[in-house]
Amino acid sequence: MTAEHDTDTPEPRLNSTEIRILGCLIEKQATNPETYPLTLNALVLACNQKTSREPVMNLSQGQVGQSLRVLEGQGFTRLVMGSRADRWEHRVDKALELVPAQVILTGLLFLRGPQTVNELLTRSGRMHDFEDAEQVVHQLERLIARGLALLVPRQAGQREDRYTHALGDPADIEVIIAARGSPVERGAGSGVSVERIEELEARIALLEERLAKLEPL
């Protein structure tokens, strides 16, 4: 089978903890390859980051560990035995037969929910080299064609359509979409551009990653 194989088999549904775990593993593989795969401790820290996460979560080691085992059974994660500590890696690319660009977009949708094309282009900057928004749209359309993503039409007060992943519980997805239907977009009328906010969030995320490396793993 190729990475672009189309299938009518329904993909497994993931809960919010499993989605967060996979999103973090995808992100850290791309942004911190020197510390990837992740120890359980490092993964918990990544899951509970205060930036680049929507919503912010407060997961315990027990919750993350249990979910990792479930994901392992579904072929989404793999335990890598080590001399000092066991580590975990994702296998989203193999489980869902995705090319690298699709893995990155899926990871971003896992971490931050419905997003515009421009948000995805900006936020993927440290993880994948998309040439322009058209490349992002092309890969999103391929994910939609396979039932792995959804187009969310712009709602009242919003200027752009959004995209979200389609691997969670349908009811949860509807709640997230409804919550994002606020009449005022982030940054609108605040005097601070969305691009500036994204830049600051990226800096904070980088600092949190450096701090995580100093934590005992």
Swiss-Prot record:
It comes from Pseudomonas fluorescens (strain SBW25). Belongs to the UPF0502 family. SUPFAM superfamilies: Winged helix' DNA-binding domain (SSF46785). This is UPF0502 protein PFLU_2135. InterPro entries: DUF480, WH-like_DNA-bd_sf, WH_DNA-bd_sf. Signal peptide: none annotated. Pfam families: DUF480.
